[in-house]
């Protein structure tokens, strides 16, 4: 059954059962003091409301029959998956640069199996959800995301997570190029960097690549009364 979500720059109509809620990289690395972003000098002090808003969005999406996909960004403990000097990721990843500056952190930042790599305690995938590792900013690169979505007839993606201006925007942009309709819930995301990075990412998304809404509006669109109005 179709529902309409109020969004910027205009409302968008979708079928929740042909839509996925994407939770991007809600790991200790990105949302918890002592994690990679914090150690690299980024401010993570205001991530707690984002976690709570994601919990709310996930609950509403699950009740509406939406697929929930959780991404975890990172690599093997030897960082082979991160790429060597021949990869631009080796030179641009702040996690890798931080570990080169602080060798005692090797094997601790974004390494699979580490505390840093784990999802935050408040966000726990449930049976029926899909958890996908990803080795780069975009969730479409070297992952089965595209085939998972296409095999289920999913064309609409609702994004939450960290960081808005890095992995969230990268994945939404790649989805746009693959003909997916991308919506970001702005109060369920958080930037890496100054506040203007959040504003710039949201501007890019709503102007060029997708739609922007918020958690309360999203939950209202998934309520039974909203479906009744559409019907």
Curated annotation (Swiss-Prot):
Keywords: Hydrolase. The active site is at residues 25, 134, 167. It holds the Pfam family Isochorismatase. One of its GO terms (biological process) is nitrogen utilization. Its EC number is 3.5.1.110. CDD domains: cysteine_hydrolases. Disulfide bonds: none annotated. Induction: Up-regulated by the nitrogen regulatory protein C (NtrC also called GlnG) and repressed by RutR. One of its GO terms (molecular function) is hydrolase activity, acting on carbon-nitrogen (but not peptide) bonds, in linear amides. It comes from the Bacteria. It catalyses: (Z)-3-ureidoacrylate + H2O + H(+) = (Z)-3-aminoacrylate + NH4(+) + CO2; (Z)-3-ureidoacrylate + H2O = (Z)-3-aminoacrylate + carbamate + H(+); (Z)-2-methylureidoacrylate + H2O + H(+) = (Z)-2-methylaminoacrylate + NH4(+) + CO2. Hydrolyzes ureidoacrylate to form aminoacrylate and carbamate. The carbamate hydrolyzes spontaneously, thereby releasing one of the nitrogen atoms of the pyrimidine ring as ammonia and one of its carbon atoms as CO2. Belongs to the isochorismatase family. RutB subfamily. This is Ureidoacrylate amidohydrolase RutB. It comes from Escherichia coli (strain SMS-3-5 / SECEC). The lineage of its organism: Bacteria, Pseudomonadati, Pseudomonadota, Gammaproteobacteria, Enterobacterales.
């Amino acid at each position: 059954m179709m529902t309409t979500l109020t969004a910027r720059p205009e409302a968008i109509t979708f079928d929740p059962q042909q839509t996925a809620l994407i939770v991007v990289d809600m790991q200790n690395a990105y949302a918890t003091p002592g994690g990679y972003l914090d150690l690299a000098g980024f401010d993570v002090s205001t991530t707690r409301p984002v976690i709570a808003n994601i919990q709310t969005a996930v609950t509403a999406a699950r009740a509406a029959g939406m697929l929930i996909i959780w991404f975890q960004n990172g690599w093997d403990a030897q960082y082979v998956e991160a790429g060597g000097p021949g990869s631009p990721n080796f030179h641009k990843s702040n996690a890798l640069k931080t570990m080169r500056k602080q060798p005692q952190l090797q094997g601790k930042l974004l390494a699979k199996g580490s505390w840093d790599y784990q999802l935050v305690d408040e966000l726990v995938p449930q049976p029926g959800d899909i958890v996908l590792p990803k080795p780069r900013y975009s969730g479409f690169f070297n992952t089965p995301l595209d085939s998972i979505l296409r095999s289920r007839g999913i064309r609409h993606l609702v994004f939450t997570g960290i960081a808005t201006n890095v992995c969230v925007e990268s994945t939404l942009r790649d989805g746009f190029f693959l003909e997916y309709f991308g919506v970001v819930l702005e109060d369920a995301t958080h930037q890496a960097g100054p506040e203007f990075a959040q504003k710039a990412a949201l501007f890019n998304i709503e102007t060029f690549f997708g739609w922007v809404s918020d958690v309360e509006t999203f939950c209202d669109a998934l309520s039974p009364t909203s479906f009744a109005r559409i019907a």
